[in-house]
From Swiss-Prot:
Its EC number is 3.1.1.96. It comes from the Bacteria. This is D-aminoacyl-tRNA deacylase. GO terms for molecular function: D-tyrosyl-tRNA(Tyr) deacylase activity; Gly-tRNA(Ala) deacylase activity; Ser(Gly)-tRNA(Ala) hydrolase activity; tRNA binding. A motif (Gly-cisPro motif, important for rejection of L-amino acids) lies at residues 137-138. The keyword Zinc does not apply. It is found in: Cytoplasm. The gene is dtd. One of its GO terms (biological process) is D-amino acid catabolic process. InterPro entries: Daa-tRNA_deacyls_DTD, DTD-like_sf. It catalyses: glycyl-tRNA(Ala) + H2O = tRNA(Ala) + glycine + H(+); a D-aminoacyl-tRNA + H2O = a tRNA + a D-alpha-amino acid + H(+).
Length: 145
């Protein structure tokens, strides 16, 4: 399981000219499930994202988590994170899940995340999404579980 999280001042996702997710201060997380991912991977990734301290405290130190500041998050499914880019000039997606399995796994991850945290919005799996954000920092981290 892969994720790239970005601390944002605001972010939104638009599908077919309809805004499907819209947050103010919080996290935009690009999420990729892989073939071997299990519920345990989803639990660990959710905990990592929710508890990771990327927001500044009063002293200006990155010492507060999403949960600490009660901010919002958008989970955006993004299979391209699984691309193998080592060879040639065209990405390979051999480690990715078939779309129908990936969709189920992403939904399972979303459900686990929602059980742990209540300010969650999502993009739409398989849709052509327009993702906009104002990155705060920029502060961006990459996770592999």
């Amino acid at each position: 399981m892969l994720s790239i999280i970005q601390r944002v001042n605001c972010a939104n996702v638009v599908v077919d000219n309809q805004k499907v997710a819209d947050i103010n201060k919080g996290i935009l997380a690009l999420v990729c499930v892989e073939k071997e991912d299990t519920q345990q991977n989803f639990e660990k990734m959710a905990d990592k994202i929710i508890k990771y301290r990327i927001f500044e405290d009063d002293a200006g130190k990155m010492n507060l988590s999403l949960a600490d500041i009660d901010a919002e998050i958008i989970l955006v499914p993004q299979f391209t994170l699984a691309a193998d880019t080592k060879k040639g000039n065209r990405p390979s997606f051999s480690s990715g899940c078939p779309p129908e399995i990936a969709k189920e796994k992403f939904k399972e991850f979303e459900n686990i995340f929602r059980r742990k945290y209540n300010k969650v919005q999502t993009g739409i799996f398989g849709a052509d999404m327009k993702v906009s954000l104002t990155n705060d920092g920029p502060v961006t981290f990459s996770f592999k579980i």
